[in-house]
């Protein structure tokens, strides 16, 4: 059984924990409490299997605190990560600049492929959820961008997240198959 480690990172108060709970069907949190360090959610998704073999997959979703005081922990969090989801609040202009740093640290410096990274512009309840195009600078403008509004259209982000998980698992499965072929030949 394949097991994938996915990091949820991004600025403080961007909605990482709320989104993580929703996508893993964990408990709801009604009041804001900043994540201290990291919170690990383990889950399976019946819609995601390994390369059409029907083999189930397990996931670890690492909900990482957005405060820079945890920066010294980041190398440990990044170890063996298969994917990174950068969550930001599209209604806070400074978040657009901050996500460049998150991308640099968690994707570029870890030599993760861009296809293993997804941006989520999370719109909080009552924010209006303006879905206009965001002015993302290169290389962020090449990444998959999903708008999340759990009040108005919760299933859109769930469907996109499942597609993302499938792409991670397919990549892991192909890599494992290549390694097995090298051993055989």
Swiss-Prot record:
One of its GO terms (cellular component) is centrosome. InterPro entries: P-loop_NTPase. Keywords: Cell projection, Cilium, GTP-binding, Nucleotide-binding, Phosphoprotein. GO terms for molecular function: GTP binding. The keyword GTP-binding applies. Gene3D superfamilies: P-loop containing nucleotide triphosphate hydrolases (3.40.50.300). GTP binds at residues 10-17, 63-67, 123-126. The modification Phosphoserine is found at residue 137. GO terms for biological process: cilium assembly; intraciliary anterograde transport; intraciliary transport. It comes from the Eukaryota. Small GTPase-like component of the intraflagellar transport (IFT) complex B. Component of the IFT complex B, at least composed of IFT20, IFT22, IFT25, IFT27, IFT46, IFT52, TRAF3IP1/IFT54, IFT57, IFT74, IFT80, IFT81, and IFT88. Interacts with IFT88. Interacts with CFAP61. This is Intraflagellar transport protein 22 homolog. It comes from Mus musculus. The gene is Ift22.
């Amino acid at each position: 059984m394949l097991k994938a480690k996915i990091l949820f990172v991004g600025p403080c108060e961007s909605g990482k924990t709320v989104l993580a709970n929703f996508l893993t069907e964990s408990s709801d949190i009604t009041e804001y409490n900043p994540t201290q360090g990291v919170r690990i959610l383990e889950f399976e998704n019946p819609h995601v299997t390994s390369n059409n073999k029907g083999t189930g997959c397990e996931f670890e979703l690492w909900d990482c605190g957005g405060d820079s005081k945890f920066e010294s922990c980041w190398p440990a969090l990044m170890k063996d990560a298969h994917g990174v989801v950068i969550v930001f609040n599209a209604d806070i202009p400074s978040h657009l600049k901050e996500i460049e740093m998150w991308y640099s640290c968690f994707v570029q410096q870890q030599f993760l492929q861009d296809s293993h990274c997804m941006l989520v512009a999370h719109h909080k309840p009552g924010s209006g959820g303006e879905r206009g195009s965001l002015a993302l600078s290169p290389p962020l403008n090449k990444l998959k961008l999903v708008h999340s509004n759990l009040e108005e259209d919760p299933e859109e982000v769930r469907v996109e997240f499942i597609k993302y998980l499938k792409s991670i698992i397919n990549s892991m499965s192909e890599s494992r198959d290549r390694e097995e072929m090298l051993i055989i030949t």
